[in-house]
Amino acid sequence: MSVTRLSFPYGESIQWHSPDQIPQLPPSPFREWLLASGSLTQKLKSHCNQFEVKVLGEAMLPPFPGELPHQGQAWIREVLLCLDGIPWVFARTLVPGAMMDSAQDNFLSLGTRPLGELLFTSGDFTPGKIEVGEFTACDSLAKLIDSLEQESHHPLWGRRRYFSHGDQQLIVSEIFLPKARQLIDRLA
């Protein structure tokens, strides 16, 4: 796996919808993974011997148009969540500048620790509803997937969730990579 020839950020603009607005969600067991209400980090950890976060990049950057309305800059962190050396999830986090002013230390000190541990254990964050999206990767995300040597035979699925911290909200988007879909489908 070599992502060094690519450049951060890798994410792309995705249309997200409430699960009840999607005419056909993927079949089980993948559907349960997509809609799991708890920590995806914990769910992933329970299915491997070694869990690893590979940080692809983090910086103050402008979000995609419509991704985080009314924000000029956001702290954006992109990571791969790997199970036993295999990248399963591409995750993109957007933290508004105002939230960074009040909670900067929480985020900048993460390193290779999963953000899910902070969001679900600190008591400072309240998870919101899950939105889902189905899409075909293009541009940077497609190049990232190619560099991971993962072939996609299906459109990609992802989920997005807002987490409240006081009167601010951050966004976490998690895209299930092709290998994850293949391995989850085998769990049936």
Curated annotation (Swiss-Prot):
Pfam families: Chor_lyase (PF04345). Substrate binds at R77, L115, E174. GO terms for molecular function: chorismate lyase activity. It is an enzyme of class 4 (lyase). Keywords: Cytoplasm, Lyase, Pyruvate, Ubiquinone biosynthesis. Disulfide bonds: none annotated. It catalyses: chorismate = 4-hydroxybenzoate + pyruvate. GO terms for cellular component: cytosol. It is found in: Cytoplasm. It comes from the Bacteria. This is Probable chorismate pyruvate-lyase. It comes from Shewanella loihica (strain ATCC BAA-1088 / PV-4). The gene is ubiC.
